[in-house]
Amino acid sequence: MSNIVWHQHSVDQAARARLKGQNPVLLWFTGLSGAGKSTLAGALERALFEAGFHTYLLDGDNVRHGLCKDLGFSVADRDENLRRVGEVAKLMVDAGLVVLSAFISPTREERDSIRARFPEGQFIEVHVSTPLSVCELRDPKGLYVKARKGEIAHFTGISSPYEAPLSAELTIDTSKGDLASQVHALIDYLTAIDVISSNRLASLA
């Protein structure tokens, strides 16, 4: 690695952000399977996109069709999956985007490792805290049924632990309230930390 030197671009993150009229950030949605991470992140992205913001959503299932298609579900492979996603998200934030990611990411160590790659304020942890009982009742992919039968090893929440965040920037239980109000809570937070400029709020009403 001693012969590999980081090449400084002539256009930096601040310049890209000014062009887009937004402050780049990574929102990291974490929670159990079926908690509503992808649904919530997708609804927020739609709202921001329709207001003219430049966004991208990284989804746990989608990245395994390409970027991480060579990885399985062992502990080592899951760690590598999140490492890759964290690096891609970092590049996207550097490009000036508002990036949303929806991954179970069950351990605090994994999430803290990704947070450490970003400057203060550019990593926002959103704990989608929907209870296991609700997630299992929803079971949109039938994974909990398989896990209860022992057909899926190391399934988070059943045969493998989920470590809830200790100090997430936001905590949302999707079993309480409706999707629109949950999205507005996220938008209010992004406004408060100046990711969203006040002169563009009208289009989010």
UniProtKB/Swiss-Prot annotation:
Reading the lineage from the top rank, the first entry is Bacteria
GO BP annotations listed: hydrogen sulfide biosynthetic process; sulfate assimilation
Pathway membership, UniProt: Sulfur metabolism; hydrogen sulfide biosynthesis; sulfite from sulfate: step 2/3
The protein's matches in SUPFAM superfamilies, at most eight in alphabetical order, are given as:
P-loop containing nucleoside triphosphate hydrolases
Keyword set for this entry? ATP-binding, Kinase, Nucleotide-binding, Phosphoprotein, Transferase
What EC number(s) are associated with this protein in UniProt?
Answer: 2.7.1.25
Q: Tell me where the transmembrane regions lie.
A: none
Task: Please tell me which top-level EC class this enzyme sits in.
Answer: transferase
Do you know which CDD domains this protein is assigned to? APSK
Q: Which GO terms describe its molecular function?
A: adenylylsulfate kinase activity; ATP binding
The annotated active site, in chain numbering, is 105
| Catalytic activity entry | adenosine 5'-phosphosulfate + ATP = 3'-phosphoadenylyl sulfate + ADP + H(+)
Keyword ATP-binding: yes or no?
A: yes
What is the name listed in the Swiss-Prot or TrEMBL entry for this protein? Adenylyl-sulfate kinase
Supply the source organism for this entry: Shewanella oneidensis (strain ATCC 700550 / JCM 31522 / CIP 106686 / LMG 19005 / NCIMB 14063 / MR-1)
The taxonomic lineage of its organism, from the top, reads: Bacteria, Pseudomonadati, Pseudomonadota, Gammaproteobacteria, Alteromonadales
